[in-house]
Amino acid sequence: MINKINKFFKNNEFSPSKQRGQNFLIDQNIINNVVEAVSKINPSKVLEIGPGLGAISEQLIKRFADNYYAIELDKKLFHHLNERLLKDHILHADALEIDWKSIFDNLGDNPTMVGNLPYNISSKLIKKFILSTYRCAIIMVQKEMGLRLLAKINSKDYSAFSALCQYSLSVSKIIEINETAFIPQPKVRSTLLFLEKKDIAFNEGYEKFLKLIFLSRRKTILNNLKNNYDPKLIIQSLVSLGFKKTSRAQELSPTQLFSLYESLSKLC
């Protein structure tokens, strides 16, 4: 596989882009783990984001045929895959811009997104997944992002983004991936995750509220919110929900934070 990749680089004068997070998967065990994870959830449709040189795509197209599609932004990679492997089951497009729902005529009951997400846009792609009509996702992300998505309350990685994702999604780790599984090797390890939507509508107001409440981790909720809400009402809401007046955002679960958001929204 390494020889094939190097041959592609040479023949196409291709240099992997750090900005686009172009690290190509070469570990067959990891490829098998991804494909097995996708197959296990019995997807009605499979959308692969950034298939690269097709390490995962090759197996997915065999298993899911017309129920599979890929999106690739890089023109050289797109043409390579379209000509040699995916044959009109790939779009040359920006995954952040295109409407994922429009790719298939009918998404069915369990549409699933798959991808090795570039670090610099992984949070945007995850939010787009939350807002989309897709139900599940099998994603590879840098370990740092994985820690944020899996973070427990009171941990250093627990953030507004953690709370937002965990309120909307069930997040579980499948496996950690060494740097050596990719070419070129990234500087950090990656994590393979399974995301599944909860039956909860996305709330834009709650997203804004989380950004405010996590503004400064050292400050209490009261101090972070007092410029946007009446301090008396903040205390009233905290006490009515059984929280301490000196509570900090990282001490509360995503559900508790949403309860506080709802309480303040009704009072203010």
From Swiss-Prot:
Subcellular location field: Cytoplasm
Which GO cellular component terms, listed alphabetically, does the Swiss-Prot or TrEMBL entry include?
Answer: cytosol
Give yes or no: UniProt keyword Signal.
Answer: no
Q: Which residues are S-adenosyl-L-methionine-binding?
A: N23, L25, G50, E72, D94, N116
The chemistry this enzyme catalyses reads: adenosine(1518)/adenosine(1519) in 16S rRNA + 4 S-adenosyl-L-methionine = N(6)-dimethyladenosine(1518)/N(6)-dimethyladenosine(1519) in 16S rRNA + 4 S-adenosyl-L-homocysteine + 4 H(+)
Q: Does the keyword Ribonucleoprotein apply?
A: no
**What sort of enzyme, by top EC class, is this?**
transferase
Describe the family membership recorded for this protein in Swiss-Prot or TrEMBL: Belongs to the class I-like SAM-binding methyltransferase superfamily. rRNA adenine N(6)-methyltransferase family. RsmA subfamily.
Q: Can you name this protein? A: Ribosomal RNA small subunit methyltransferase A
